[in-house]
Regions:
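Catalytic and GAP-homology cores of small GTPase regulators
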Residues: 1-75
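Acidic-enriched, low-complexity/disordered segments with a strong bias for Aspartate over Glutamate
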Residues: 6, 17, 44, 52, ...
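Flexible domain-boundary/linker segments
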Residues: 14-17, 117, 156
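Short alpha-helical interface elements
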Residues: 21-29, 82, 124-129, 144, ...
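Alpha-helical catalytic/interaction cores of small GTPase-regulatory modules
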Residues: 56-152
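C-terminal regulatory/linker segments that are acidic, Ser/Thr- and Pro-rich
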Residues: 134-179
């Protein structure tokens, strides 16, 4: 699998990956309430674990390894929602997507789009059932959100505050390379 994978999966991030990564850095200042409209979620241990899983997604060679990482991420998201809502209601994309967006922005994966493309092209029919296909679609949706986000996509943020926070985040990131 490794020999084939090395030929079909790009060694370097594609242009779309770089756009997503750049905007993730720009958005590194966000807090959950800005995406969710509420601040009652407990994210203890979620971000480090999710970041580790996104690294596993990046390093996974087979579509099955990558899908398993996504399934683990969404199990964690489901647990957060159930824990914080204290109910057993059905959890849909509207509930999980903002938390996944938050996790991806904070984790800043290097090749999110490349992983989407790889899964979309090489995932076999047995894996391509409803839930797995939805996971792959959510990667795409999150990438598009991050690339195209404006202040209007967030709760309680003015255009000026959004621009100021994004500029500060980029400046801080650039300074971290100098130090």
């Amino acid at each position: 699998m490794t020999k084939i994978y090395d030929k079909i999966f790009p060694k370097e991030p594609e242009f779309e990956d770089i756009k997503i990564l750049h905007n993730s850095v720009r958005l590194s200042w966000i807090e959950p309430n800005v995406l969710l409209g509420k601040n009652n979620y407990n994210f203890d241990n979620f971000l480090p674990e999710t970041k580790d899983l996104l690294v596993k997604l990046e390093n996974g060679k087979s579509p099955l390894q990558k899908i398993n990482c996504l399934n683990e991420i969404f199990k964690k998201i489901t647990n957060i929602i159930q824990f914080n809502n204290q109910n057993d209601e059905f959890i849909g994309v509207d509930d999980s997507l903002p938390i996944f967006q938050y996790a991806v922005i904070k984790a800043q994966p290097i090749r999110l789009f490349s992983n989407y493309k790889y899964l979309n092209m090489y995932m076999n029919k047995e894996l391509r059932n409803g839930p797995n296909d939805q996971l792959v679609t959510q990667i795409y949706v999150v990438g598009e959100f991050i690339k195209n986000v404006t202040y209007e996509n967030f709760y309680g943020i003015s255009k000026e505050q959004f621009n100021r926070n994004c500029t500060e985040a980029i400046n801080n990131d650039m300074l971290s390379y100098i130090k």
